[in-house]
Amino acid sequence: MSYGYFKDEGAMVYSGSDKHNIALSVKSEVNKRLSVTGRINFDYLKVYGAGVAGNGTNEGGSNVDAKFNKMVQILQYRPTIGIRGNDSDLLAGEDPVLSDADGNVMQNPLIAAAEEKDNKETRTLQANGGLTFKIIKGLTFRNNTGMRYQLYRRELFYGDQSIMGRRNGIYGSIRNTETGSFQTSNVLTYDKRF
């Protein structure tokens, strides 16, 4: 049995991920003719924050509209206001120089990170088992069976100060997805040497 916990801080403030993993494996030779194996694995992954790629306008978050890419915003947003202003004005809201610009696509990266929520949770349960039975000398039966069940939840929200909220208004969505699969295989092997 094993347990693992991983915590990563994201490239953007207010972002990162947490992952829990629990696994249990068993292997037993019941007698000379029968052996069994089994494995159960459970993962819980939570990814939070908006990240740095895309503008989130599609489900994959991989929109190629580069002017709204978060990393581009970080690199283009000016770090100081100049000698006639106060640098703290850049941290508190919009850039005063650009606040009246019609069609301005520049966004304070700190405000963007605080106003854009893209939280994803994934729970995955996998179980596999197998048995090998030696029927007679040279004749072996093997069965492998497995299942996978996954729950996925995505909560997406753009506040009124986000670049998307400023252009299109506040909006959000919640998406739940549930998937499952099952597999089995049976193999009969006869091994006779002449």
Language-model segments: which ranges?
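Transmembrane beta-strand segments that form the barrel wall of outer-membrane beta-barrel proteins
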Residues: Y3-K7
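Surface-exposed loop/interface segments of Gram-negative outer-membrane beta-barrel transport/assembly proteins
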Residues: A11-V13, S25-T124, R142-F194
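Transmembrane beta-barrel architecture of outer membranes
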Residues: S17-A23
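A cytosolic small-molecule/anion-sensing beta-strand core signal
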Residues: A127
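Active-site and adjacent substrate-binding regions of carbohydrate-active enzymes
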Residues: G138
